[in-house]
Amino acid sequence: MADCHISLHWDGDGLNYDKGSFYISVPDSVKGMEPVASHWTQHNALGASLVDGLRAQGCKINGGGSMSIDLTQTSYSTIPSVDMELGNACSNHSDETLNIQAEGLLRGINAYYGR
């Protein structure tokens, strides 16, 4: 079994500007249901660590770094699981930028696991 699940996305939202990165947090409406109730804090902690890692690398962060949406793939997972939005179609997708984002995500993973 995997230690965690991180799904990487760039929104196709039609915006004409780079909105930055954020993670999809677990909404209050499902936090009381199992298996969500037993695992949502892990999901949100992983997401927050990833955003902190991206921020430390100088990546643009959208708002407070999270948006609450009920996603079955993450909310109902029994391992730490998060959907990371790394920008959109207007974001810089150069190798340099992707490497910076990769370093930020690695930094966040290491922080989450106390490395």
Where are these regions (language model features)?
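Active-site-proximal helix/loop segments of hydrolytic enzymes
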Residues: M1-R115
